[in-house]
Amino acid sequence: MKYFLLTAALLAVLARPARAQTTPAALNDAAAFQQGTFQGAAADQAHYAVTYQLDSDDPKLIQQTLRNIGNALADERLKGKLTVELVAFGNGVAVFRKDQPYAAQLAALKQQGVILAQCQNTMREKKISKDELLPIISYVPSGTGELIIRQAQGWALVHP
């Protein structure tokens, strides 16, 4: 009986409903939302970093990813505070191929400081040479390794 009561008490404590964040920023955001004045989170940090993951050769997904990167770079809250990396691996290598229509968009993103990184494991597995890829890109040993490292460094990860 003693164990039953102890177990019941423990379950009662653990079964409490989760509470929403109660940080001052979260409370202010909630109040602004209720009043219809919420305009997005405040970018109160000095610097932000994000890695976009691209592992698909679907043209719509590639365009969406490039558009998402452009939108982040154009966000007034993040101006001068944002570092962006695009990591392509698997079928995502299509974005960096010379025979694909993305060169101008990628050059514009690189001009804005975006790191364009291709997984070398993918190149080996698919037997793709650097000559087949745009000369403006960089190379990383492993695309997933890059994501793991960046996340551990505090970078946000986006996989459109």
PLM regions with names:
Residues 23-26, 97-160:
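A cross-taxonomic marker for long C-terminal extensions/tails that follow the last structured domain
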Residues 16-20:
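Sec/Tat signal peptide C-region and signal peptidase I cleavage site
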Residues 56, 91-93, 123:
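Short, glycine/serine-rich, charged loops/turns that create anion-binding
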Residues 7-14:
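Bacterial N-terminal signal peptides
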Residues 23-85:
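N-terminal secretory signal peptides
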Residues 50-53, 85-88, 115-118, 159:
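Structural recognition of the beta-strand scaffold that forms the well-ordered cores
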Residues 82-96:
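Acidic helix-start/capping segments at beta-turn-to-alpha-helix junctions
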Residues 1-4:
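Positively charged n-region of N-terminal signal peptides that target proteins for export
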